[in-house]
UniProtKB/Swiss-Prot annotation:
Protein name: Large ribosomal subunit protein uL24
UniProt xrefs under PROSITE patterns: RIBOSOMAL_L24
Role, per record: One of two assembly initiator proteins, it binds directly to the 5'-end of the 23S rRNA, where it nucleates assembly of the 50S subunit. One of the proteins that surrounds the polypeptide exit tunnel on the outside of the subunit.
Lineage summary: Bacteria, Pseudomonadati, Pseudomonadota, Alphaproteobacteria, Rhodobacterales
Gene Ontology CC terms: ribonucleoprotein complex; ribosome
């Protein structure tokens, strides 16, 4: 099955503690049905100091389920993603506007 959301897409969170937040997808895990979104679902990682690296509390974006994300169209509104053929090529398009993504 083709991926509706890909790395680099601008998305909005639909549910959970980060509902309404927007960000860019930095990684997608299709087998787990999850994605990592910049600045969303952030956890604090405590690291021990080493001779080469300073320790402390580092913020790390954790994976979020794809069902809780929606793509942002050109107008900045949440949209569903569809597929269609343009010539010989299969393309993704925003269902709200019909524009090719």
């Amino acid at each position: 099955m083709a991926a509706k959301l890909k790395k680099g897409d601008r998305v909005v969170v639909l549910a959970g503690k980060d509902k309404g937040k927007q960000g860019e997808i930095t990684a997608v895990m299709p087998k787990d049905n999850k994605a990592v979104v910049e600045g969303v679902n952030v956890a604090i990682r405590h690291t021990k100091q080493t001779p080469t690296a300073q320790g402390g509390r580092l913020a790390k974006a954790m994976p979020i389920d794809l069902s809780n994300l929606a793509l942002l169209d050109a107008n900045g509104k949440a949209t569903r993603v569809g597929f269609r053929f343009e010539g010989e090529k299969k393309v993704r398009y925003a269902k709200t506007t019909g524009d090719v993504i």
